[in-house]
Amino acid sequence: MKNRDRILVKIDKLREKRDILCQQRFLYTIPFQEDIYAIAYTRSSKKSNLNLLENSVLYKKYSVITIKRLITQLRQQNFLKIFFRDCYRNQLDNPKNHPYNKLLLEGLILILEVFSPIQIQLGRNEWKSLQSIHSLFLFMENKFLHSNFILDIKIPQSLHPEILIRIFRRRIQDTPFLHLSRSILHEYQDPITSDTSISPFSREQNSLLILLWNYYVYEFEYLVVSSWKRFSRLQSIFSLDRIDRTHFDRKIKHVIRPYWIISSKISSFTKNPCIHYVRYKNHSVLAFQGTNYLAKKWRNYLLNFWQYHFHCWVQPHRIFLKRFSRNSFSFLGYILGIRTRINKVQAKMEDELPITCLITKELCPIIPFLLLVNSLARGGFCTNLGRPVSKLSWTTLTDDDILKKFDQIWRSVYYYYSGSINNHGLFRLRYIFRFSCAKTLACKHKSTTRIVWKRFSLNSFLRSFLKKPELVNSSVSKYYLHKRRFWYLDIIQINPLTISLRERYN
């Protein structure tokens, strides 16, 4: 206990003294400390259930002697042969489930969690992280309207472990620690992916994959920021030269003086280009204003970007160029586009009342109804044509549980798609859920849907959820009721129905 408290105090001091830590780049000595594995084991025991922990292989084989034996083998010159000797002795034993390997994984995760934020702090990018899903759409409504091109980017999900080692080499200058990390990562034959739901790895391995994936995405965003800054400065110089040249061509007949005298007075006319970036997991969107030639240049630049910085080839269809004013794109289960809105404005003057048209742009989030119907059909709620069917797997539940499950699903769907402009899609989804619930109860009780309507009063079922939330201020409530669109900033996870949509677009 004293050793663990001592190492925790030591780690806190290292986090406080970031400048000293930047100079001490030698991390290879940390895996040889016994306290690291004690802290990792204590942390894993708090996250896991005690009943499951007692039956686990790590709990049975974890001891101080095991840690000392592991550290002794790490000090060997050819430690890999000794480290996996027991695993290779039995062909049926999987080296990924070896207790030594799990201990090393926990220790490596702890080291990277402590030191990676400090290294990232040194080159912090300028992107702002938002926890709410709907806050991304609010940002896009404010910023994307002035952009005419977007780059729909699908970041590669699968990574080779050697790519991550090369990323570490830019931040960590400790060669032995890199060799140790390479030895651990190369033990997993499967590529590293960001989707842990389909990953065959254990909890410890998934924690390492998430940590490495976040580090990889940070490097990508950091390099994009630096590249855009360089491009912004070059674009400003180019705009300045073009303004000066136009001014020089107009005044050359009347003013006789050197060109460099004029160029120093027109810097206020230049305007830096602006880029807007949004990302959720591996799906990111770049929006900017420029010409078609500039947009193609940016697409070609990003295609070569991964090959140069991350040593991997990206398929061209993963970076799709679209003109935002004409095309729409899919993001987080919505179909997003821009539409023009014409408002007639009447100005009051002394003699007449002229009517002018004010043209504005607004973001149009649309529900992909047909794709959602396909997702509901795979879930057993309806057919591919949208006809409701009974959920046969739920007929063994009680009536209250069936009503509660349909209630929860409808609430999540309604609140997630409350910001769409086509409310008729929500009404059609409500129709599917209502009749699917009625047919499920009718199938359970072996009756007709008409009897179920009368018994459970399903005519009023789910009707209350279509009402807008009441606001505290009545005047504000009257103002917002006619807009019929709401963004809920407490939604922090994507709706399960949209996961299949993301897989289709990926």
UniProtKB/Swiss-Prot annotation:
Stored InterPro entries:
Domain_X (IPR024937), Maturase_MatK (IPR002866), Maturase_MatK_N (IPR024942)
Q: Name one GO molecular function term.
A: RNA binding
- GO CC, alphabetical: chloroplast
Q: Which UniProt keywords apply?
A: Chloroplast, mRNA processing, Plastid, RNA-binding, tRNA processing
Q: Show the stretches that span the lipid bilayer.
A: none
UniProt xrefs under Pfam families: Intron_maturas2 (PF01348), MatK_N (PF01824)
Does the entry feature the keyword Chloroplast, yes or no? Answer: yes
Does the keyword field hold Chloroplast? yes
Its annotated compartments are:
Plastid, Chloroplast
* Biological process according to GO: mRNA processing; RNA splicing; tRNA processing
Q: What does this protein do?
A: Usually encoded in the trnK tRNA gene intron. Probably assists in splicing its own and other chloroplast group II introns.
What does the similarity note say? Answer: Belongs to the intron maturase 2 family. MatK subfamily.
The protein's name is Maturase K
Q: Which species does this protein come from?
A: Angiopteris evecta (Mule's foot fern)
Recite the lineage of the species. Answer: Eukaryota, Viridiplantae, Streptophyta, Embryophyta, Tracheophyta
